[in-house]
Amino acid sequence: MAPQPFYQDRGTPIALRQVLHAASELGYRVDLLTFPIGADVEFPGLRIFRADNPFDFRAVPIGLSLRKLLLDASLLAAARGRLASETYTCVHALEEAAWPAALLARRHGIPLLYDMQSSIPEQLRKYMLAHVPPVPMLMARAEQWLLTRADLVVASAGLGTRVRRMAPGTRVREWRFPSAPSEVPHEASLALRRRLGLPADAPVILYSGTFEAYQGLGELIAAIPEVLAGEPSARFILVGADRAGRAALGGAAEELERAGVLTLVERQPRSAMPGYLAMADVLVSPRAFGGNLPLKIFDYLAAGRPIVATNISTHRAVLTRRTAVLVEPAADALAQGIVSVLRSPSKGRELGEAARQYAFEHLGWNRFVRSVGEIYEDAHRRALA
Protein backbone atom coordinates (compact mmCIF):
# COMPACT_ATOMS: atom_id res chain seq x y z
CA MET A 1 0.00 0.00 0.00
CA ALA A 2 1.74 3.11 -1.27
CA PRO A 3 0.00 6.48 -0.74
CA GLN A 4 2.07 8.20 -3.40
CA PRO A 5 1.90 8.86 -7.14
CA PHE A 6 3.73 5.85 -8.54
CA TYR A 7 5.83 5.96 -10.53
CA GLN A 8 7.32 9.44 -10.40
CA ASP A 9 10.94 10.50 -9.98
CA ARG A 10 10.70 11.63 -6.36
CA GLY A 11 11.92 10.25 -3.05
CA THR A 12 9.54 7.57 -1.80
CA PRO A 13 8.47 6.29 -5.25
CA ILE A 14 12.15 5.94 -6.21
CA ALA A 15 12.81 3.91 -3.07
CA LEU A 16 9.69 1.80 -3.60
CA ARG A 17 10.63 1.01 -7.19
CA GLN A 18 13.95 -0.38 -5.96
CA VAL A 19 12.16 -2.58 -3.42
CA LEU A 20 9.73 -3.86 -6.07
CA HIS A 21 12.58 -4.61 -8.46
CA ALA A 22 14.42 -6.56 -5.77
CA ALA A 23 11.28 -8.48 -4.77
CA SER A 24 10.77 -9.42 -8.41
CA GLU A 25 14.32 -10.72 -8.73
CA LEU A 26 13.71 -12.84 -5.63
CA GLY A 27 10.65 -14.41 -7.25
CA TYR A 28 7.97 -12.83 -5.06
CA ARG A 29 4.50 -12.07 -6.36
CA VAL A 30 3.54 -8.55 -5.31
CA ASP A 31 0.31 -6.60 -5.68
CA LEU A 32 1.01 -2.87 -5.45
CA LEU A 33 -1.94 -0.69 -4.45
CA THR A 34 -1.20 2.96 -5.09
CA PHE A 35 -2.61 6.32 -6.16
CA PRO A 36 -4.30 6.71 -9.57
CA ILE A 37 -1.45 8.98 -10.69
CA GLY A 38 1.93 8.03 -12.10
CA ALA A 39 3.53 5.84 -14.73
CA ASP A 40 3.22 2.07 -14.72
CA VAL A 41 6.36 -0.02 -14.34
CA GLU A 42 6.76 -3.67 -15.25
CA PHE A 43 8.60 -6.32 -13.25
CA PRO A 44 7.93 -10.08 -13.33
CA GLY A 45 5.48 -10.97 -10.57
CA LEU A 46 4.27 -7.39 -10.07
CA ARG A 47 0.65 -6.31 -10.52
CA ILE A 48 -0.31 -2.67 -10.04
CA PHE A 49 -3.77 -1.75 -8.77
CA ARG A 50 -4.77 1.89 -8.50
CA ALA A 51 -7.29 3.54 -6.20
CA ASP A 52 -10.27 5.24 -7.79
CA ASN A 53 -9.93 8.87 -8.84
CA PRO A 54 -13.45 10.33 -8.51
CA PHE A 55 -12.15 13.91 -8.62
CA ASP A 56 -9.94 13.31 -11.68
CA PHE A 57 -6.78 14.57 -9.98
CA ARG A 58 -3.80 14.78 -12.34
CA ALA A 59 -1.09 15.50 -9.75
CA VAL A 60 -0.55 15.40 -6.01
CA PRO A 61 1.91 17.72 -4.24
CA ILE A 62 4.52 16.59 -1.75
CA GLY A 63 3.26 16.91 1.82
CA LEU A 64 -0.16 17.23 3.43
CA SER A 65 -3.02 18.47 1.28
CA LEU A 66 -6.76 17.97 0.90
CA ARG A 67 -6.06 16.25 -2.41
CA LYS A 68 -3.79 13.72 -0.70
CA LEU A 69 -6.30 13.05 2.08
CA LEU A 70 -9.03 12.32 -0.47
CA LEU A 71 -6.74 9.95 -2.34
CA ASP A 72 -5.80 8.28 0.96
CA ALA A 73 -9.50 7.59 1.56
CA SER A 74 -9.82 6.12 -1.93
CA LEU A 75 -6.75 3.96 -1.29
CA LEU A 76 -8.29 2.60 1.92
CA ALA A 77 -11.48 1.61 0.09
CA ALA A 78 -9.42 -0.17 -2.56
CA ALA A 79 -7.37 -1.96 0.11
CA ARG A 80 -10.50 -3.42 1.64
CA GLY A 81 -11.46 -4.79 -1.75
CA ARG A 82 -8.05 -6.32 -2.41
CA LEU A 83 -7.91 -8.05 0.98
CA ALA A 84 -11.43 -9.38 0.52
CA SER A 85 -10.61 -10.92 -2.85
CA GLU A 86 -7.04 -12.22 -2.37
CA THR A 87 -5.03 -14.11 0.24
CA TYR A 88 -1.77 -12.36 1.10
CA THR A 89 1.31 -13.32 3.10
CA CYS A 90 1.67 -9.82 4.54
CA VAL A 91 0.70 -6.20 4.10
CA HIS A 92 3.63 -3.90 3.31
CA ALA A 93 2.37 -0.37 3.97
CA LEU A 94 4.20 2.90 3.46
CA GLU A 95 3.84 6.13 5.40
CA GLU A 96 0.29 7.07 6.49
CA ALA A 97 -1.23 4.01 4.79
CA ALA A 98 0.18 1.94 7.66
CA TRP A 99 -2.48 3.14 10.14
CA PRO A 100 -5.49 1.65 8.32
CA ALA A 101 -3.27 -1.24 7.19
CA ALA A 102 -2.63 -2.14 10.83
CA LEU A 103 -6.35 -2.63 11.40
CA LEU A 104 -6.91 -4.46 8.12
CA ALA A 105 -3.94 -6.79 8.63
CA ARG A 106 -5.15 -7.74 12.09
CA ARG A 107 -8.67 -8.36 10.80
CA HIS A 108 -7.32 -10.73 8.13
CA GLY A 109 -4.76 -12.36 10.42
CA ILE A 110 -1.65 -11.43 8.44
CA PRO A 111 1.52 -9.57 9.47
CA LEU A 112 2.03 -5.84 8.94
CA LEU A 113 5.34 -4.57 7.59
CA TYR A 114 5.47 -0.81 8.21
CA ASP A 115 7.74 0.94 5.72
CA MET A 116 8.64 4.10 7.65
CA GLN A 117 10.16 6.35 5.03
CA SER A 118 9.73 9.29 7.41
CA SER A 119 8.20 10.15 10.76
CA ILE A 120 4.76 11.61 10.04
CA PRO A 121 4.76 13.86 13.16
CA GLU A 122 8.15 15.22 12.09
CA GLN A 123 6.92 15.90 8.57
CA LEU A 124 3.88 17.77 9.92
CA ARG A 125 6.02 20.13 12.01
CA LYS A 126 5.96 22.71 9.23
CA TYR A 127 2.22 23.23 9.74
CA MET A 128 1.06 25.60 12.50
CA LEU A 129 -1.68 23.25 13.68
CA ALA A 130 0.92 20.60 14.51
CA HIS A 131 2.24 22.86 17.31
CA VAL A 132 -1.12 23.60 18.97
CA PRO A 133 -1.75 21.52 22.15
CA PRO A 134 -2.79 18.74 22.37
CA VAL A 135 -1.97 17.98 18.71
CA PRO A 136 1.74 17.17 19.27
CA MET A 137 0.88 14.70 22.03
CA LEU A 138 -1.86 13.07 19.96
CA MET A 139 0.45 12.67 16.94
CA ALA A 140 3.16 11.11 19.10
CA ARG A 141 0.68 8.67 20.61
CA ALA A 142 -0.69 7.75 17.19
CA GLU A 143 2.83 7.04 15.94
CA GLN A 144 3.64 4.97 19.02
CA TRP A 145 0.40 3.00 18.61
CA LEU A 146 1.35 2.16 15.03
CA LEU A 147 4.91 1.20 15.90
CA THR A 148 3.71 -1.19 18.61
CA ARG A 149 1.13 -2.79 16.27
CA ALA A 150 3.55 -3.44 13.40
CA ASP A 151 5.13 -6.88 13.21
CA LEU A 152 8.21 -5.38 11.57
CA VAL A 153 9.28 -1.79 10.92
CA VAL A 154 11.68 -1.07 8.08
CA ALA A 155 12.73 2.53 8.54
CA SER A 156 14.68 5.04 6.56
CA ALA A 157 18.28 5.22 7.75
CA GLY A 158 18.37 7.42 10.84
CA LEU A 159 14.88 6.56 12.12
CA GLY A 160 15.76 3.26 13.79
CA THR A 161 16.69 5.00 17.04
CA ARG A 162 13.31 6.73 17.16
CA VAL A 163 11.50 3.43 16.63
CA ARG A 164 13.48 1.65 19.37
CA ARG A 165 12.82 4.49 21.80
CA MET A 166 9.06 4.60 21.16
CA ALA A 167 8.45 0.85 20.73
CA PRO A 168 11.27 -1.16 22.35
CA GLY A 169 9.55 -4.47 21.67
CA THR A 170 9.10 -3.97 17.91
CA ARG A 171 11.53 -5.50 15.43
CA VAL A 172 13.17 -2.78 13.32
CA ARG A 173 15.57 -2.66 10.39
CA GLU A 174 16.91 0.30 8.43
CA TRP A 175 17.00 0.67 4.68
CA ARG A 176 20.31 1.05 2.86
CA PHE A 177 19.20 1.84 -0.66
CA PRO A 178 21.48 0.92 -3.56
CA SER A 179 23.40 3.43 -5.60
CA ALA A 180 26.12 2.18 -7.90
CA PRO A 181 29.10 4.37 -8.78
CA SER A 182 28.78 5.50 -12.39
CA GLU A 183 31.41 6.86 -14.74
CA VAL A 184 30.41 10.06 -16.54
CA PRO A 185 32.69 11.10 -19.41
CA HIS A 186 34.53 14.37 -18.80
CA GLU A 187 33.20 15.69 -22.10
CA ALA A 188 29.63 15.16 -20.86
CA SER A 189 30.35 17.18 -17.72
CA LEU A 190 31.81 20.00 -19.80
CA ALA A 191 28.77 19.96 -22.08
CA LEU A 192 26.44 20.21 -19.08
CA ARG A 193 28.46 23.13 -17.72
CA ARG A 194 28.12 24.92 -21.06
CA ARG A 195 24.38 24.27 -21.13
CA LEU A 196 24.04 25.80 -17.66
CA GLY A 197 26.22 28.76 -18.58
CA LEU A 198 29.03 27.83 -16.19
CA PRO A 199 32.69 28.62 -16.86
CA ALA A 200 34.67 25.45 -17.51
CA ASP A 201 36.99 26.12 -14.57
CA ALA A 202 34.47 27.47 -12.03
CA PRO A 203 34.15 25.43 -8.81
CA VAL A 204 30.59 24.08 -8.67
CA ILE A 205 28.70 23.48 -5.42
CA LEU A 206 25.59 21.40 -6.05
CA TYR A 207 22.46 20.55 -4.06
CA SER A 208 19.76 18.18 -5.29
CA GLY A 209 16.40 17.41 -3.71
CA THR A 210 13.18 19.07 -2.68
CA PHE A 211 12.95 22.69 -1.57
CA GLU A 212 11.03 21.94 1.63
CA ALA A 213 11.86 24.05 4.70
CA TYR A 214 13.54 21.18 6.55
CA GLN A 215 16.16 20.91 3.78
CA GLY A 216 17.92 24.00 5.14
CA LEU A 217 18.20 25.83 1.83
CA GLY A 218 17.72 29.18 3.54
CA GLU A 219 21.00 28.67 5.38
CA LEU A 220 22.70 27.55 2.18
CA ILE A 221 21.53 30.69 0.36
CA ALA A 222 22.82 32.79 3.26
CA ALA A 223 26.18 30.97 3.04
CA ILE A 224 26.76 31.83 -0.63
CA PRO A 225 28.11 35.38 -0.10
CA GLU A 226 30.51 34.04 2.55
CA VAL A 227 31.77 31.38 0.15
CA LEU A 228 32.21 33.96 -2.62
CA ALA A 229 34.25 36.16 -0.29
CA GLY A 230 36.83 33.39 -0.12
CA GLU A 231 36.28 31.79 -3.54
CA PRO A 232 34.90 34.44 -5.92
CA SER A 233 34.71 32.06 -8.91
CA ALA A 234 32.44 29.54 -7.15
CA ARG A 235 29.02 28.81 -8.63
CA PHE A 236 26.02 27.19 -6.92
CA ILE A 237 23.53 24.85 -8.60
CA LEU A 238 20.31 23.84 -6.83
CA VAL A 239 18.49 21.01 -8.61
CA GLY A 240 14.83 20.27 -7.86
CA ALA A 241 13.24 23.71 -8.05
CA ASP A 242 9.55 24.22 -8.66
CA ARG A 243 7.45 27.38 -8.53
CA ALA A 244 6.70 27.10 -4.81
CA GLY A 245 10.32 26.26 -4.01
CA ARG A 246 11.60 29.27 -5.91
CA ALA A 247 9.18 31.55 -4.11
CA ALA A 248 10.16 30.15 -0.71
CA LEU A 249 13.83 31.03 -1.26
CA GLY A 250 12.96 34.72 -1.37
CA GLY A 251 14.65 37.84 -2.66
CA ALA A 252 18.19 36.87 -1.65
CA ALA A 253 18.13 33.95 -4.07
CA GLU A 254 16.78 36.17 -6.85
CA GLU A 255 19.66 38.62 -6.37
CA LEU A 256 22.20 35.79 -6.50
CA GLU A 257 20.59 34.48 -9.68
CA ARG A 258 20.79 37.91 -11.30
CA ALA A 259 24.45 38.10 -10.29
CA GLY A 260 25.08 34.81 -12.11
CA VAL A 261 26.41 32.91 -9.09
CA LEU A 262 23.28 30.82 -8.42
CA THR A 263 21.36 28.65 -10.87
CA LEU A 264 18.05 26.99 -9.98
CA VAL A 265 17.32 23.90 -12.06
CA GLU A 266 13.92 22.22 -12.18
CA ARG A 267 13.55 18.63 -11.02
CA GLN A 268 15.48 16.27 -13.27
CA PRO A 269 14.79 12.65 -14.20
CA ARG A 270 16.77 10.25 -12.06
CA SER A 271 18.66 9.09 -15.13
CA ALA A 272 20.08 12.61 -15.59
CA MET A 273 21.41 13.04 -12.06
CA PRO A 274 24.76 11.20 -12.43
CA GLY A 275 25.80 13.90 -14.89
CA TYR A 276 24.93 16.70 -12.48
CA LEU A 277 26.68 15.01 -9.56
CA ALA A 278 29.81 14.30 -11.59
CA MET A 279 29.99 17.95 -12.64
CA ALA A 280 30.14 19.16 -9.04
CA ASP A 281 33.26 19.96 -7.06
CA VAL A 282 31.27 19.83 -3.81
CA LEU A 283 27.93 18.14 -3.03
CA VAL A 284 26.02 19.75 -0.20
CA SER A 285 23.16 18.65 2.07
CA PRO A 286 22.24 21.52 4.43
CA ARG A 287 19.30 19.65 6.00
CA ALA A 288 18.06 21.36 9.16
CA PHE A 289 15.94 18.64 10.75
CA GLY A 290 14.11 15.39 10.10
CA GLY A 291 15.00 11.89 11.21
CA ASN A 292 14.94 10.19 7.80
CA LEU A 293 18.08 10.17 5.66
CA PRO A 294 17.39 11.66 2.22
CA LEU A 295 17.94 9.27 -0.68
CA LYS A 296 20.29 11.74 -2.31
CA ILE A 297 22.97 10.92 0.27
CA PHE A 298 23.33 7.43 -1.20
CA ASP A 299 23.73 8.97 -4.67
CA TYR A 300 26.18 11.55 -3.32
CA LEU A 301 28.35 8.78 -1.90
CA ALA A 302 28.30 6.79 -5.12
CA ALA A 303 29.25 9.88 -7.13
CA GLY A 304 32.63 9.96 -5.42
CA ARG A 305 32.57 13.72 -4.92
CA PRO A 306 33.39 15.53 -1.64
CA ILE A 307 30.30 16.03 0.53
CA VAL A 308 29.54 18.87 2.95
CA ALA A 309 26.57 18.04 5.19
CA THR A 310 25.09 19.28 8.42
CA ASN A 311 26.19 17.43 11.53
CA ILE A 312 22.77 16.09 12.52
CA SER A 313 21.87 12.56 13.57
CA THR A 314 20.12 11.94 10.26
CA HIS A 315 23.32 12.41 8.27
CA ARG A 316 25.44 10.62 10.86
CA ALA A 317 23.38 7.46 10.27
CA VAL A 318 25.56 6.96 7.18
CA LEU A 319 28.10 9.77 6.87
CA THR A 320 31.28 10.02 8.93
CA ARG A 321 34.13 12.52 8.97
CA ARG A 322 35.96 10.10 6.69
CA THR A 323 33.34 10.44 3.95
CA ALA A 324 32.08 14.01 4.48
CA VAL A 325 32.74 17.38 6.06
CA LEU A 326 30.16 17.59 8.84
CA VAL A 327 29.26 21.11 9.98
CA GLU A 328 26.71 22.80 12.20
CA PRO A 329 23.40 23.69 10.49
CA ALA A 330 24.24 27.39 10.15
CA ALA A 331 25.23 29.58 7.20
CA ASP A 332 28.71 30.44 8.46
CA ALA A 333 29.53 26.80 9.22
CA LEU A 334 28.29 25.67 5.80
CA ALA A 335 30.40 28.35 4.13
CA GLN A 336 33.51 27.36 6.08
CA GLY A 337 32.99 23.69 5.23
CA ILE A 338 32.58 24.39 1.51
CA VAL A 339 35.59 26.72 1.37
CA SER A 340 37.74 24.20 3.25
CA VAL A 341 37.14 21.66 0.49
CA LEU A 342 37.64 24.11 -2.37
CA ARG A 343 40.95 25.28 -0.93
CA SER A 344 42.30 21.77 -0.40
CA PRO A 345 41.96 19.63 -3.53
CA SER A 346 43.78 16.76 -1.82
CA LYS A 347 41.23 16.78 1.00
CA GLY A 348 38.42 16.76 -1.56
CA ARG A 349 39.94 13.79 -3.38
CA GLU A 350 40.33 11.84 -0.12
CA LEU A 351 36.70 12.49 0.84
CA GLY A 352 35.45 11.56 -2.62
CA GLU A 353 37.46 8.35 -2.77
CA ALA A 354 36.28 7.32 0.70
CA ALA A 355 32.66 8.05 -0.25
CA ARG A 356 32.89 5.98 -3.42
CA GLN A 357 34.53 3.12 -1.54
CA TYR A 358 31.70 3.15 1.01
CA ALA A 359 29.16 2.97 -1.81
CA PHE A 360 31.06 0.11 -3.45
CA GLU A 361 31.17 -1.88 -0.19
CA HIS A 362 27.72 -1.12 1.25
CA LEU A 363 25.37 0.15 -1.46
CA GLY A 364 25.63 -2.54 -4.13
CA TRP A 365 22.54 -3.96 -5.80
CA ASN A 366 23.11 -7.59 -4.75
CA ARG A 367 23.52 -6.57 -1.13
CA PHE A 368 20.23 -4.67 -1.30
CA VAL A 369 18.41 -7.61 -2.89
CA ARG A 370 19.61 -9.85 -0.06
CA SER A 371 18.31 -7.37 2.52
CA VAL A 372 14.88 -7.29 0.86
CA GLY A 373 14.85 -11.09 0.86
CA GLU A 374 15.63 -11.17 4.59
CA ILE A 375 12.79 -8.73 5.29
CA TYR A 376 10.18 -10.73 3.39
CA GLU A 377 11.45 -14.05 4.76
CA ASP A 378 10.87 -12.62 8.23
CA ALA A 379 7.33 -11.60 7.25
CA HIS A 380 6.69 -15.04 5.75
CA ARG A 381 7.82 -16.78 8.95
CA ARG A 382 5.42 -14.62 10.93
CA ALA A 383 2.59 -15.46 8.55
CA LEU A 384 3.19 -19.17 9.15
CA ALA A 385 3.50 -18.79 12.94
Functional labels for PLM-detected ranges:
Residues 1-40, 86, 227:
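N-terminal subdomain of nucleotide-sugar transferases
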Residues 18, 73, 77-81, 99, ...:
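Membrane-proximal helix-turn-helix segments that form the acceptor-binding/catalytic region
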Residues 36, 123, 136, 140-172, ...:
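A short, active-site helix/loop in glycosyltransferases that binds the activated sugar's phosphate group
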Residues 155, 199-215, 221-224:
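Conserved donor-binding/catalytic core segment of Leloir-type glycosyltransferases
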Residues 184-198:
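A short helix/loop element that forms part of the nucleotide-sugar donor recognition site in Leloir-type
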Residues 247-274:
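Nucleotide-activated donor-binding/catalytic signature segment of Leloir-type glycosyltransferases, i.e.
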Residues 282-283, 306-309:
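Short hydrophobic beta-strand element within catalytic cores of glycosyltransferases
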Residues 321-332, 340-346:
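Conserved acidic donor-binding segment of nucleotide-sugar-dependent glycosyltransferases
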